[in-house]
Amino acid sequence: MKPIRVLAVDDDPDFQYLLEQTVGSQPDMELVAVCPDGVEACRAARRHCPDIVLMDLDLRNTGMDGAEAARTIRLKTAARVIILTADDDPSTVIDASVHAFASGYVFKSQFTLLLPTIRETAAGSTPQSHLICAALLQSLTSAERAVFYSLLGKDVALHSSTKTIANQQTSVLRKLGLPNKQTLRHIFSTYMG
């Protein structure tokens, strides 16, 4: 069985070491790189093609915060992102996860959940991914949600004119901050298989 390829991103050398020891000691995981900042993480994600990216949310003074780096990685690669954070405020973490199109998150205070979360995310989804997806879709009207599901290839009856549907497609992409339908399908295949 192929190991889960993991890229870790954290600006704290002590936490980097902890990630190296924890993930690196797992027989079903391969730590492909550890990066101290978002810019390097984006490059490493393209170079190493990880399955999972562990992204620290608070990358201090590194030029790109964790949520933005995670979003860039999600938009440009097939990697799934797990947000790591010392911030125990759930709303902050959900907001960042939504912005980053993350698959899940782990509070650093609950570090023992990291390995199971990596495995669950690599296998398909976590309970958090459903929460994040629901939060992402919250901004859409019911008509836009129907159009959203049709864009994903779901069999949905759309009761509008072609022009209205085209306008709703544009609205869905704008609200989700996505450039096109292909990117929407790429991002949401993580949440909906």
Predicted regions and their residues:
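Basic, Lys/Arg-enriched C-terminal extension of HTH/homeodomain DNA-binding domains
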Residues: T170-G193
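Active-site beta3 strand of CheY-like receiver
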Residues: H48-L59
